[in-house]
A protein has these predicted regions:
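Interfacial segments at transmembrane-helix termini and the short loops linking adjacent helices
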Residues: 109-132, 266-270, 331-360
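Hydrophobic alpha-helical transmembrane segments
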Residues: 126, 130, 159-219, 391, ...
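Membrane-interface junctions at transmembrane-helix termini in multi-pass inner-membrane proteins
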Residues: 137-160, 357-387
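Signature of the first transmembrane helix
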Residues: 7-69, 135, 237-267, 393, ...
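Membrane-water interface segments that mark the loop-to-transmembrane alpha-helix transition
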Residues: 11-23, 61-113, 127-130, 303-328
Length: 459
């Protein structure tokens, strides 16, 4: 296989790995400050609130993925109309931002966060949560900046900007600590960090679009010199399946935290929250490659056999890398959790092992998630995600009776392996080849097209 593909796929992961000490130090310092100013018992719920954004990835309605694909295809074969697709995407996401802000404000006004999180929260805490979720809502349209950068093949820039979010969060936490803040106010820092990074990514993305305009026509960029008079909502045709995917993923992978907040003790929730934070650092190194893979596969849709070969190599590569990452979590997470919490929170080894299993499961599925991006393929993914979510919740609830938080992590790993990775092995080659035949049949409607399998033989 061409080594340039591996370089393109993993350059972002290498950059993330190089920057990992900075992000890790920022995360550890941020957690230490929050624990010191909220207390051990309150840290779990404050961290859960700060991670509410992870439960709302469907807020972009799948528009981000379609924008990445549109920009990636445009970079291979420039075509008119990119600006209309971008404006349609921004129109939809600005509407989503208004909806999130209004909904969050109403929930804070009527103190509805308390029953949702299963906690006895004060009126001021409810309002603080509403402010944080509103900031997250305003950051939703800004998320297209990273999507555009990935589509342009600048995954390295997207990764660098994503890492600044942790640094911004630490800066806001330090300011609040110096100002004498306490309690729920510290849940705002992650939302503010995300918003700040979004501003930077949006500015750079449209700067690069304008810079590359001579190769595609300056009028195609959203900030081009010619006025935009219409929207192209047809470009968002694959968003319906992406909405289901982005709802099903947090439902299967993140709901355990909410259920634990309602059924477990404060210490169990704090242990789970801290372990999830350590897991997120490890997973971010591997998941960074998904953006580059999305672009690589989108630009090679005309070569199905090559795409299938790349997918197979990536499954093996990610499987090996995730095994090392899981070993890291199993060996070091209990020690790291104790250091970060000043010995107050002890992560059980079984919890670390469960998250390690989840890391391997998600990594094995990651290449297929970036490969299957046509509307039909996304609908297949959507069905698999729903199966995954159902398995994750059912198995997690069953195991949590005896394993606590580890049961939810192990349930999620089971859901991903059975609901997503197993279908990948069975369906990916056929779906990729069928997609190529369908596109050619539309291009040559009068000809009979004979599909070939991934070894190049006629079926």
């Amino acid at each position: 296989m061409d080594r340039s593909i591996f370089r393109q796929a993993f350059s972002g992961s290498v950059l993330r790995l190089i920057g990992l000490p900075i992000v890790a130090i920022a995360g550890i310092a941020n957690t230490s400050l929050v624990v010191a100013n909220t207390g051990i018992a309150a840290y779990g719920i404050v961290n859960t609130v700060a991670m509410l954004g992870a439960l709302l990835p469907f807020s972009d309605l799948g528009v981000g993925g379609t924008v990445t694909t549109a920009v990636a295809l445009d970079s291979v074969a420039p075509r008119a109309g990119l600006k209309h697709k971008l404006k349609a995407a921004y129109f939809v996401l600005i509407a989503v931002a208004f909806f999130i802000v209004i909904t969050a404000s109403m929930m804070g006004m009527f103190a509805l966060w308390s029953p949702l999180l299963g906690q006895d929260l004060s009126v001021s805490d409810n309002r603080i949560i509403s402010v944080g979720v509103s900031v997250f809502g305003l950051a939703v349209p800004l998320g297209l900046g990273v999507r555009i950068l990935i589509g342009l093949g600048r995954n390295d820039l997207a990764v660098a900007i994503a890492m600044t979010s942790s640094i911004f969060s630490l800066a806001f936490t330090a300011v609040m600590a110096l100002a004498g803040g306490h309690g729920m106010i510290f849940s705002l820092t992650s939302f503010l960090g995300l918003f700040s990074a979004g501003l930077i990514s949006t500015f750079l993305a449209h700067h690069l679009l304008r810079k590359g305009a001579p190769t595609r026509d300056a009028s195609q960029t959203l900030l081009g010199s010619k006025p935009i008079r219409r929207y192209d909502f047809r470009a968002l045709s694959g968003s319906g399946a992406l909405i289901i995917i982005t709802i099903g993923l947090p439902l299967g992978l993140e709901t355990g935290r909410i259920l634990l907040s309602r059924t477990g003790s404060p210490m169990m929730l704090s242990q789970y929250a801290l372990m999830a934070q350590l897991y997120a650092i490890t997973w971010s190194v591997l998941s960074t490659a998904s953006g580059a893979l999305w672009t690589i596969f989108a630009q090679r849709r005309a070569d199905p056999n090559g795409s299938i070969a790349i997918w197979r190599w990536m499954v093996v590569s990610f499987g090996l890398l995730s095994a090392f990452g899981a070993a890291f979590l199993w060996a070091l997470a209990p020690w790291a959790g104790s250091v970060i919490s000043h010995g107050e929170i002890l992560i059980p080894p079984v919890l670390a092992m469960s998250f390690g299993a989840l890391l391997i499961a998600q990594s094995l599925h990651l290449p297929a998630g970036s490969l299957l991006t046509t509307p039909r393929q996304l609908w297949v993914q959507a069905v698999c995600v729903l199966v995954m979510a159902a398995l994750s919740l059912s198995v997690g609830l069953l195991l949590a009776r005896t394993m606590g938080g580890a049961g939810f992590a192990l349930g999620a790993a089971t859901g991903v392996l059975v609901g997503q990775f197993l279908p990948d092995l069975l369906l990916v080659p056929r779906l990729v080849l069928e997609g190529t035949v369908r596109r050619k049949s539309r291009k040559y409607p009068g000809q009979r097209l004979v599909p070939v399998n991934y070894r190049g033989h006629r079926e």
